[in-house]
């Protein structure tokens, strides 16, 4: 295919603004499916977790044909925790679709990714999605997008980018908000006419920058990247080199070459500059390496991936229930699995501490919780500590990561949200009314947001939307209270029964139901006071002839509060761990024995 018939674009949007749905419709209307083929919704979110949570975690590639053009589309994650993915992906494309919700307008992640795209000089097509929402405010949202482009120092050409109005769910787009579209033709036409075809000398020596990695059990690692110059062929011998490490010059061979077609990849014999391709055969290929030929070794510079901001310790499970539910339980299993994750995920850092513990650093709570949930589903059993922020030294001062947090809340909850943010060292920078709601923007330390999402949902009665993205580093802002309450800790090992739980439920909120197996040192609830309390939930009622069988009142138990993985991570204090197995999530104290725990606490006080 000639270069002028190629277009490479990425889709930028905030979580849940509909980018994966839009790609679905582009695939349908680009003739990727047969007429009678039944297709799942959001077909690009192929991982189980992605489909359940409705978010995109890994950037995916696909291609659609329109007339005689081939449009390579890259679907990027909208969540800031996966922004390591976004930065690399933008290097592969020549333009971006900026997708914005017609009611919510541009959100923090949109800002983060758009900044990266503008810095690379990409052309932008603005797409206002969900125009059929009852609370859509199309004209205001367009003004907000223009303000955002001004804020981010867009060039004149980027500022005058074309705007389209669409409903991705119905698969329609139009040039004006007052017209009703019939299909996505306006979108395809704008992409073809406005985005430049890829540049690159097809006759020169090969240069291919690897921007993404896939893994397949049959062929091993698959490199994905864009050919910047020259032509690559199947079975060709290449030199793998690295811009940051001149000593790396390995001779390798490309075994299979693939192009992206619709939802899959098809093997091809050769591809030239401007194409996005995948290849297998180089077992240790990593992101950021360049493929060249022997007589022209010129590695390409690579986008520096932002540093991780939070860290957790992963270690083998040493609780009394260890090894009961998991398939992979040893430190060797854990090490191998984390090393395998590093092959795919560039923004993850793993460091071994001691014999069976690993410090795992990532871009945010979501980033690490997805890793934990994925490992758990694969049959791993391990335990993790509470997340800690990674500080940096800048000009001799210790600085911590600061996030820009945007919250859309009902008017009657504004006071409590501002109050809670102030307690967490948050600084209110703007407050704008949007319909019957308020949009609040804060600059808040990353550690101030740990454990806040639950409180936020309670304060806004489940109606608030919050999102945050890393903004800058500032000197450490002093102490922030993580949790104001203590835990209810099981005193002995056994099975929780209704009588024992009935005696305890007035002391706080229970996390377990009767019949749950517990061990000494396991957390069974949240205490009303700001200190831990040891409780006996296994206590059975003494049955003697003194008590008539019918004279007792039935025990009334409130239903237990069941915590999700993220809620457990947010709940943990420094002296607590989360035990993760394929079947259970159990929170526990680091020191299980009650007396040893008391001694350690008094020692720490003194």
Regions found by a protein language model. Name each.
Residues 1-100, 104, 144, 213-216:
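P-loop NTPase switch module centered on the Walker A-proximal segment
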Residues 38-41, 126, 152-164, 198-209, ...:
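Interdomain boundary/hinge elements
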Residues 123, 133-193:
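Canonical P-loop GTPase G-domain recognition
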Residues 167, 353-367:
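Short glycine/threonine-rich beta-strand-turn micro-motifs
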Residues 207-312, 322-324, 485, 494-544, ...:
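Conserved nucleotide-binding/hydrolysis modules and their immediate coupling elements
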Residues 231, 283-284, 362-368, 411-414, ...:
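Helix N-cap motif at beta-to-alpha junctions
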Residues 260, 265-268, 399, 444, ...:
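Long insertion/accessory domains within large nucleic-acid-processing enzymes
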Residues 319-342, 554, 558:
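A short, contiguous, amphipathic alpha-helix enriched in charged residues
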């Amino acid at each position: 295919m000639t270069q002028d018939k190629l277009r490479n674009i990425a889709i930028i949007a905030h979580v849940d603004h509909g980018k994966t749905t839009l790609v679905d419709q582009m695939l349908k209307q680009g003739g990727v499916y047969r007429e009678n083929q039944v297709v799942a919704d959001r077909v690009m979110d192929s991982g189980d977790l992605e489909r359940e949570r409705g978010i995109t975690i890994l950037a995916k590639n696909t291609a659609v044909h329109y007339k005689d053009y081939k449009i390579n589309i890259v679907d990027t994650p909208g969540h800031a925790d996966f922004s390591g993915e976004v930065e690399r992906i933008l290097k592969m494309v020549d333009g971006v679709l900026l997708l914005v919700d017609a009611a919510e307008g541009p959100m923090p992640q949109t800002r983060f990714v758009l900044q990266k795209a503008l810095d690379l000089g990409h052309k932008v097509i603005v797409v206002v999605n969900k125009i059929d929402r009852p609370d859509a405010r199309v004209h205001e949202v367009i003004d907000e997008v223009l303000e955002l482009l001004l804020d981010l120092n867009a060039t004149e050409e980027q500022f005058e980018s074309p705007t389209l109005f669409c409903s991705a769910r119905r698969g329609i787009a139009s040039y004006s908000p007052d017209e009703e579209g019939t299909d996505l033709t306006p979108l395809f036409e704008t992409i073809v006419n406005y985005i430049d075809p890829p540049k690159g000398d097809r006759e020169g020596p090969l240069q291919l920058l690897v921007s993404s990695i896939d893994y397949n059990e049959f062929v091993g690692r698959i490199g994905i990247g864009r050919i910047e110059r020259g032509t690559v062929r199947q079975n060709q011998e290449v030199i793998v080199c690295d811009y940051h490490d001149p000593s790396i010059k390995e001779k390798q061979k490309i075994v299979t070459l693939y192009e992206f077609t619709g939802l899959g990849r098809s093997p091809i014999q050769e591809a030239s500059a401007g194409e996005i391709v995948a290849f297998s055969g180089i077992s240790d290929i990593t992101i950021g390496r360049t493929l060249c030929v022997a007589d022209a070794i010129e590695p390409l510079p690579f986008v520096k991936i932002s540093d991780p901001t939070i860290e957790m310790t992963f270690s083998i499970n040493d609780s009394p229930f260890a090894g009961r539910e998991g398939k992979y339980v040893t430190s060797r299993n854990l090490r191998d699995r984390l090393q395998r994750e590093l092959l795919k995920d560039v923004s993850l850092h793993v460091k071994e501490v001691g014999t069976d513990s690993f410090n795992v650093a990532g871009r945010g709570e979501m980033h690490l919780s997805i890793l934990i949930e994925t490992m758990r589903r694969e049959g791993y059993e391990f335990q993790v500590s509470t997340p800690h922020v990674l500080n940096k030294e800048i000009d001799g001062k210790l600085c911590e990561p600061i996030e820009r947090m945007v919250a859309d809340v009902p008017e009657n909850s504004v006071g409590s949200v501002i109050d809670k943010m102030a307690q967490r060292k948050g600084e209110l920078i703007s407050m704008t009314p949007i319909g019957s709601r308020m949009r609040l923007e804060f600059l808040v330390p990353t550690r101030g947001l740990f454990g806040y999402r639950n409180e936020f949902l309670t304060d806004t009665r489940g109606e608030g939307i919050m999102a945050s993205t890393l903004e800058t580093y500032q000197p450490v802002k002093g102490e922030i209270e993580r949790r104001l309450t203590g835990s209810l800790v099981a005193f002995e090992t056994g099975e929780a029964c209704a009588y024992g739980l009935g005696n305890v439920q007035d002391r706080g909120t229970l996390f377990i139901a009767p019949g749950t197996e517990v061990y000494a040192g396991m957390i069974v609830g949240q205490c009303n006071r700001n200190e831990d309390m040891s409780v006996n939930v296994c206590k059975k009622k003494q049955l003697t002839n003194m008590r008539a069988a019918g004279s007792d009142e039935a025990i009334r138990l409130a239903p237990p509060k069941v915590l999700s993985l993220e809620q457990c991570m947010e709940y943990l204090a420094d002296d607590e761990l989360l035990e993760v197995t394929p079947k259970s999530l159990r929170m526990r104290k680091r020191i299980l024995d009650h007396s040893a725990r008391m001694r350690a606490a008094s020692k720490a006080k003194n």
